[in-house]
Amino acid sequence: MNAAGPNFGYDMSLEAEGPLVFHGDKGYSVKSSEGQASYYYSQPFFKMKGTLTLPEGDINVEGNAWLDREWSSQPLSENQLGWDWFSLSLDNGAKLMGFQLRQTDGLNFSSSSWIEPDGSLTSYGNN
């Protein structure tokens, strides 16, 4: 994949070294106690290599990459103010993804996924 602008560009190759991961219940990811939800999957096992182009010159880079895809037919709940998301890739190949939706009443809605190196998933719903 590549893109370029006046002060920044990149040319990267991605290679999946593990399976797609479907969060929640086979990809159905609940977002509120009122029933908002989305379909959500990730490819957390990309190896990435390429070049960043900056005004100072090109920089060769390589490492791990994570791609998410998520879609929904409805907006978030009216009492949800924002969304915090993170992912961690551990040295043993395991991954952790988590998010919280901040709510006006302070009772934030959260969910997370533990991903084994083989791609098997354990989902943790709102606690």
Regions from the PLM with identified roles:
Residues 1-127:
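Structured soluble/peripheral alpha/beta segments that form catalytic or ligand/cofactor-binding pockets
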